[in-house]
Amino acid sequence: FDPQCHEPTGHSDKNPTSYDQRWIHIKRPAVIVGGEMELSSVEINHNPTTNLCEAPMQLKANCGIFVVDDFGRQRIKPEDLLNRWILPLEKRIDFLTLPNGIKVQVPFDELVIFCTNIDPKNLLDEAFLRRIPYKIRVYDPSPEQFKQIMTFLAPKYGIEWDDSMMTYLLERHFEGKRPMRCCHPRDILDQVVNAAAYRRTRPVLTREFIDLACMCYF
C-alpha cells in the first residue's frame, strides 16, 4: 500500500478474521510516471537504512492503469524499458528479484498506456511496436473543441468566461500563426492567473491579460 498511489475504499469486512489485516481494500489505482523514470523504477528497491523494500511502480498499478508519460524522454531508453517488459506485456506476469537474489513471480494485470509526442517509428523498431498493439493518435482540437476546453477550465481558475475574448484569442494569436494544442487552454489560463497575482488583481479575460499570457507562453 502506497498512500501516494492508492486510495482506500473504506470498505470493512464484517468478519475481520476472514483475511489478513495487512491487506487494505482500495480503489483501482492510476499510477503516472514521467521523465524521472529509470530502470531501477521497475525493480524492487531496498533501503539499507530502514531495511525495507519498496515495490516497483508497475506493481503498485496492478488492477489499475499505469501511464508512462512523455515516453521516449525518460532517463531510461525506450528499448531498454521494452526489453525489460517483453514478458510482462505478453504473459501478464513479471519476475522481480528480492535483495537476497531470489526471484518471485507477481501479476502484471494492468492497462499500460504510453503517451508521447514523438513518432513511434522513431522510438522503437517493428518488433517492439508489435508488443504495443493499439496506437491512438490524438489530433489537434478544432476551434470549437478549443473553446469547450477553455469554457470547462476557466471556472476552475476562478475566471469568468467571456465569448468575445475567446474570439479575440483565436483571431489574434492562433489563426494563421500556430496550431492549437489541447494543452494551450490550461497553460494560457495559468499565465493569466500568474499575471493577475503579480499585479495583485483578480484574474479576468481581457485583451491585455491575453496578450501578456501569449507573449510569455509563445
Q: Positions of the model-derived regions?
A:
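Non-catalytic alpha-helical coupling and interface elements of nucleotide-dependent molecular machines
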Residues: 63, 90, 94, 133, ...
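Residues immediately C-terminal
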Residues: 67, 72-74, 120, 134, ...
